[in-house]
A protein has these predicted regions:
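Ligand-binding loop in jelly-roll beta-barrel domains
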Residues: 74, 88-114, 247-274
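Short acidic-glycine-tyrosine-enriched beta hairpin
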Residues: 73-90, 232-248
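A short, N-terminal "cap"/entry segment at the start of jelly-roll beta-barrel domains
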Residues: 1-33, 43, 116-192, 202, ...
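Short, conserved beta-strand element in jelly-roll/cupin
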Residues: 38-42, 52-71, 109, 197-201, ...
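Conserved short histidine dyad/triad with adjacent acidic residue
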Residues: 18-22, 37-53, 177-183, 196-212, ...
């Protein structure tokens, strides 16, 4: 439900050319299917092997530093505020730190198969097992492959990498809601998930109080402070808080900014059969067919006499 990245343990990655540290923020906050990891790499380090997921989409967001996004043998410069989308079954990819080091959030949409291809290791992850099954783990094979060959950075970046300031902000203003939304994931071509950079005005709400029937969401507070309204409870939040909202909890949520405003990343899966309920107004949104209506909540036995 709620965690703070200062309280989540770091795991050191030390496998030959794979170096860095990782936090499993999504699991710490109670995510069910979706994933969120934070990778911190010193200058020149690479914490993850070159890989591509069979059915899982990833969105990276650079918190601090600079480096290179390696994609299918090409390299692209990335820096703080960049969003990088890796669609399922697309190019093999990894990310490397530059001279300043690199701090990256990696969101993942969840997998039904657990299949991941590591081309340099010439191996597959198959959930907790791997192929070839009679050899070392894919991580060991990746380490044995040695340092990743790095070409010179390309002069232009692909459409799957966008800088937050280059994405237009869409205002959301009505009643107590006053916020600006930058749809970073959509701008970078995400299909199975979405990510927004949300700036909430001081004292205002980010969006109406709501809960999801099918989509899972993860929020990361990047700056400012405020309050998380969760059902009948309220919890203070500030920079570094991570909030996971699995689907079908029946518990609505809302962010309310404090005096300094609130900036957060709002990531979520995309489901065509999504249903959203707004308790404050008793509305239901059938997103797949674009129909909204007001409902009266009843007891199971109402009208059954």
């Amino acid at each position: 439900m709620l965690a703070h990245w200062d309280d989540v343990e770091w795991t050191r990655i030390d496998r030959g050319p794979l170096q860095g540290s990782r936090q499993r923020l999504g699991a710490a906050a109670g995510a069910v299917r979706a994933g969120l990891s934070r990778y911190r790499m010193g200058p020149g380090e690479r914490a993850m092997p070159a890989h591509v997921h069979a059915d899982e989409e990833e969105i990276f967001y650079v918190l601090e530093g600079s480096g290179l996004s390696w994609q299918g043998g090409r390299a692209y410069a990335v820096a703080s505020g960049d969003c990088i989308v890796h669609r399922a079954g697309a190019e093999a990819h990894t990310i490397l730190a530059g001279d300043e080091g690199l701090d990256v959030l990696a969101f993942s949409s969840g997998s039904d198969t657990g299949i991941t291809w590591l081309p340099r290791a010439n191996a597959w992850w198959m959930g907790p097992r791997w192929l070839p099954s009679d050899g070392p783990s894919p991580f060991a094979r990746e380490a044995a492959a040695g340092e990743l060959e790095l070409p010179e950075p390309e002069p232009t970046r692909p459409a799957t990498i966008v800088a937050a300031p280059d994405v237009a902000a869409d205002p959301m203003r009505h009643g107590r809601v006053e916020s600006q939304w930058r749809e970073l994931g959509a701008a970078a071509g995400a299909a199975a998930s979405g990510m927004n950079l949300v700036e909430v005005a001081p004292g205002a709400c980010a969006a109406p109080f709501h809960c999801h029937g099918a989509e899972e969401e993860i929020f990361v507070v990047l700056a400012g402070e405020g309050t998380l309204r969760l059902g009948s409870k309220h919890a203070p939040v500030h920079t570094g808080h991570v909030v996971a909202r699995p689907p079908a909890t029946r518990i609505a949520h809302q962010f309310i900014a404090g005096e300094r405003g609130l900036t957060l990343l709002a990531w979520g899966t995309c489901q065509p059969n999504e249903i959203i309920f707004y308790p404050d107004s008793s509305k239901v949104d059938l997103c797949g067919i674009g129909v909204k209506f007001r409902v009266e909540q009843l007891d199971y036995w109402d009208g059954e006499e």
